[in-house]
Amino acid sequence: MQLHPEPRPHPETQAHPETQAHLETRGTRVRPGTPSLLRELNDRAALDLLLGGEMLTRSQISEYTGVSKVTVSQMLTRLEERGLVMIAGEQAGNRGPNAALYSVVPSSAYVAGLYVESDMVSAAVADVTGRRVADVSVNPNGADDPVEIVRGTVERVCARAGVEVGRLSALVIGSPGVVDPRTGEPRLAVNLPAWHEGALDALRGAWRKPVVIENDVNLAAMAERAAGAAVGADDFVLVWLGGGLGLATILGGKLHRGTAGAAGEIGYLPVHGAPLHTDIRHPASGGFQALAGASAVRTLAAEHGLAAPTAAEAVQAALSSGSRGAGFLDELAHRVAVGVASVCAVLDPGLVVLGGDVGKAGGTALADRVAAGVASIFPARPRVVPTGVPGEPVLRGAMLAAVAQARAVLLASVADPQ
């Protein structure tokens, strides 16, 4: 018996190449082995297909995996007995009875994703299909202990979802700052001083469940690639323009983190027109952050007669303020282009996505200006576009990563009972 499943890409796992270890059996032929091993691999192949989100008939699963319909029936029976697969409908046939349509049981696994900021924590719960069942936003009210913040938020969103906390298979937390790729521990989060080395161990000890902390901009890039402006792109950068500045780099379909996890901390990038940093604990003291960060954008807006409480609102006001707003947008785009051109000189990406509150607010008006600015100071002409992710991209990326992890756990749990 041979197993030869047809590759069927999942947007969630495409967004996270580093989590794809669970796909090792896909697209390969099984080596000769015991019947128990073959049953296990076949069951995993069928479950993997159904985790893609489609409802499939027995004949379709047979076609995709290359095994007989009789074997597929046995596979599905075993998966049904384990509560992983169910009959979800029927497909009308040209002849004979309708064919049963199989799907994964959505409640076979649940996950949670969080986006932790200094003044707000957003969270959501989804089932293993990726369907979001509840979300909440919580003001931490000055609390800074990671375990306290996460516990309170997760308990609240699980209560809203009607899901027991103990049923969560994975938890992914997005936060600003540097995350050590070797340990997974946060190392430098200026706005979240309590999120330092040891936070991940504390969270795992408290939850006794898989927990991942990831840089917020990296998660946003995963969301862009799965369902935003970078769908299908294997090489692109996401430039985050918000309260802080950040960069996520996807090269060859993989996220580039750097040796210490600091790749993308472009707020520290030395640029012309801004002083050098004197203290890395204060990013706004110099570099690109001092030129194009939120504080600098608000100051620039005031100089153009555009008073607004936030940088994003200043950009929105500029879009409807005629020539006065155009002058502000031109100068802002020039500043952003200086940083983007520096990135392009090293990476030469074909696509640059402008994200964050400012990038989203600026839309194509800002993106087109940045593209023109980059072209005037750099020989290549990358395509520059605004974010295409609806809603909160960091939280969406966290949910995608969590679902991918839950699916990996589910696939790994499939073992022959005999």
What do the predicted segments below correspond to?
Residues L114, V128, A170-G286, V403-Q418:
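Phosphate-binding/catalytic loop of phosphoryl-transfer enzymes
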